[in-house]
Design a protein with these regions (language model features):
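A short, hydrophobic beta-strand element within the central beta-sheet of small alpha/beta folds
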Residues: 1-3, 14-18, 55, 122-124, ...
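Receiver (REC) domain switch/output surface
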Residues: 3-6, 10-15, 20-40, 67, ...
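Short acidic, S/G/P-rich loop/turn micro-motifs used as interaction or catalytic elements
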Residues: 23, 57-61, 106-107, 126-132, ...
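Conserved acidic segment of CheY-like receiver
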Residues: 48-59, 64-89, 99-101
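Acidic, metal-coordinating helix/loop segments flanking the phosphotransfer/catalytic sites
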Residues: 79-121, 129-131
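Short, polar loop motifs at secondary-structure junctions
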Residues: 83-87, 159-164
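Acidic catalytic/metal-coordinating carboxylates
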Residues: 104, 132-141
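Terminal, compositionally biased segments used for targeting/anchoring and flexible tails
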Residues: 162-290
Length: 290
């Protein structure tokens, strides 16, 4: 079944979802509404990260949104399980990345401009409305613009047409085929590898791996042995802050990481700021094994 977006008046209906038997959709709808209501306050006060999903198909929104929230919540719960009291548990849940949905080029651009300093990643379809008409190149144009302005933000381009893979690689952006039988697993892999939900992999500028940390404890342990070139490589690309933000680690020390990253000439300040993040997490009762 295909629903024509023009059949619905957005003044009366915020968004259309399609029930396919997945009970997680109901919770995802509630979380989506909460994120839209709280994102302005949470980004301003706590620098909470934002994921923008650009999709106009109710069917795919209804399929993908529960998966996205499930990945984020599972990461947050893995941290909260070791909390000492309810206060850090509540803080961690409030500090999880927010997911915002856009169904048109103009709305996606508006969200991007508004929350650009807090972006964790962008997931976009290829074909959706632009200037009031369905544009087969809207997703390509949007991601290309975002890559030019914020080159370090991970981009995911999904489409039902395999021919778009080459165009996505030219941006560059990760490409996933909507018709893939393992689409959900591939999206989970994107979260793990590109959005900071997996291990922090230390690499040299040439791509050679020199270390790996699964949690804050391991990050603190291996930092003294990581080559300066690797630390500066990641710091200048805001990889540390992105990885920590994905885990809802929002200490005051983290606020200094962007400034350190942009003009880093020595690895010691970056090491100190990153280690301070784990010390802060330990003080508030969060698990260093997150």
């Amino acid at each position: 079944m295909r629903l024509d977006p023009q059949c619905f008046n957005e003044d009366c209906i915020n968004r259309v979802f399609i029930w396919s038997g997945n009970a997680d959709l109901l919770l995802a709808i509630i979380k989506s509404v909460e994120d839209a209501m709280n994102v302005a306050y949470d980004t301003e006060r706590a620098r909470v990260r934002v994921i923008i999903m650009v999709e106009d198909s109710p069917l795919y929104i209804s399929s993908l949104l529960p998966l996205l929230y499930k990945e984020i919540v599972s990461q947050t719960q893995a941290v909260m399980e070791e909390s000492l009291n309810e206060e850090p548990r509540f803080f961690r849940m409030r500090a999880r990345p927010k997911i915002l949905i856009a169904s048109t080029y103009e709305k996606a651009l508006e969200l991007y401009r508004t929350f650009q300093p807090y972006l964790l990643g962008i997931l976009s379809d290829v074909r959706f409305p632009r200037n009031g008409r369905l544009d087969p190149d809207a997703g390509y144009a949007l991601l290309k613009l975002m890559k030019e302005e914020t080159p370090d933000v991970p981009l995911l381009n999904f489409s039902s047409e395999e021919s778009n893979r080459e165009r996505a690689s030219a941006i560059p952006a990760v490409f996933l085929n909507k018709n893939s039988p393992i689409l959900h697993e591939e999206i989970r892999g994107f979260f793990q590898k590109h959005l900071g939900f997996g291990d922090f992999v230390f690499r040299l500028p040439d791509g050679h791996e020199v270390g790996r940390a699964a949690n804050l404890r391991q990050l603190e342990t291996i930092l003294p042995d990581i080559p300066k070139e690797s630390i500066l490589y990641h710091a200048r690309r805001n990889h540390f802050s992105g990885w920590l933000m994905a885990r809802s680690v929002l200490p005051r020390a983290l606020l200094s990481l962007p400034a350190i990253s942009s003009a880093a000439t020595a690895a010691r300040p970056v090491r100190g700021a990153a280690i301070a993040c784990r010390c802060w997490a330990r003080r508030v009762g969060a698990s260093p094994d997150a």
